[in-house]
């Protein structure tokens, strides 16, 4: 992801969105392939076959990758920060951790990704228990979520190049809350509100995934973005742990998912507030 963005500094949002969308589609493409392999052999053999295939593909593709030259600038493009006399400083991970804005961005990532990680983990179960879908029909919910997740990464990345990263994340936070409220209002047979809800959550989650690589590079420089974004990814890991855990515990306690949607709404609103906290630090820096 970071290598691609270095070659396209004028389109960091779009390129970050496309690359994250492509690796996100792996969760859609791989399962049916693995299912066929397991059916033909067994689980242990499937792990070996997939592992060897990945090793060959990844190592093979690595021969075609090139390191981006230092201070690379596409023809005809002038870096806006340099033109404004406000050049972004390339910070390493230690310097990044010393800045207050890093922790704001980390918490924003967790809050923004919370609803997506929560619903992705239980999308099929929600469709079955809340809407009354059959297991076969409920499986389409996962596919719909994956499609809007991938679309959100590309569309939000492109949008962030036009209106700015933080403005795009503000919109994504609101969209996620709207999606959660639609799920909260969903009952038996509520196909329309259910699919609209997971579509909104998919777009919101995809937006955070697509925008954050460029967002991190914009804030701390592109030179060390591979490491810096890897550390920033801890925010997603937090959402990946607390989101599904909260949903399972609430369902086990209450026998319904509605309380989990309200908890996720609180995180989404907190994320929206954090976008203004980020703006405060950004203005202070300027």
Q: What is each residue range found by the language model?
A:
Residues 1-21:
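Cytoplasmic helix-loop-helix junction between adjacent transmembrane helices
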Residues 23-70:
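Helix-loop-helix hairpin linking two adjacent transmembrane segments in secondary transporters
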Residues 27, 219-254:
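A late C-terminal transmembrane helix in Major Facilitator Superfamily
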Residues 32-41, 46, 127-128, 159-160, ...:
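Interfacial helix-cap and linker-helix signal at transmembrane-aqueous boundaries
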Residues 67-90, 286:
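Flexible cytoplasmic inter-helical loops of multi-pass small-molecule transporters
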Residues 94-156, 244-247:
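Extracytoplasmic gate region of multi-pass secondary transporters
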Residues 162-173:
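Cytoplasmic membrane-interface "Motif A"-like loop-to-helix N-cap segments
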Residues 175-188:
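C-terminal ends and interior cores of transmembrane alpha-helices
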């Amino acid at each position: 992801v970071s290598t691609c963005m270095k070659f396209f500094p004028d389109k960091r949002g779009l390129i970050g969105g496309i690359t994250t969308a492509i690796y996100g589609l792996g969760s859609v493409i791989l399962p049916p392939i693995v299912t066929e392999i397991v059916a033909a052999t067994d689980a242990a053999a499937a792990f070996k076959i997939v592992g060897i295939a990945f090793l060959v593909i990844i190592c093979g593709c690595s021969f075609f990758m090139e390191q981006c030259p230092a201070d690379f600038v596409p023809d005809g493009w002038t870096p806006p920060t340099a033109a404004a006399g406000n050049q972004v400083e390339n910070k390493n991970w230690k310097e990044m951790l010393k800045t207050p804005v890093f922790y704001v961005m980390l918490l924003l990532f967790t809050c923004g990704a919370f609803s997506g990680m929560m619903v992705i983990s239980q999308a099929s179960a929600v469709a079955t228990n809340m809407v009354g879908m059959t297991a076969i029909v409920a499986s389409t919910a996962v596919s719909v979520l994956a499609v809007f997740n991938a679309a959100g990464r590309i569309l939000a990345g492109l949008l962030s190049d036009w209106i700015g990263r933080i403005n795009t994340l503000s919109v994504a936070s609101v969209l996620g809350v709207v999606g959660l409220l639609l799920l909260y209002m969903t009952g038996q047979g509520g196909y329309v509100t259910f699919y609209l809800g997971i579509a909104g959550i998919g777009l919101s989650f995809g937006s955070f995934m697509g925008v954050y690589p460029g967002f991190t590079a914009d804030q701390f420089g592109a030179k060390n973005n591979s490491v810096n974004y890897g550390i920033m990814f801890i925010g997603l890991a937090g959402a990946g742990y607390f989101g599904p855990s909260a949903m399972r515990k609430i369902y086990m306690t209450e026998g319904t998912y509605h309380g989990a949607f309200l908890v996720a709404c609180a995180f989404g609103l907190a994320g929206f507030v954090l976008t203004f906290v980020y703006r405060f630090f950004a203005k202070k820096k300027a």
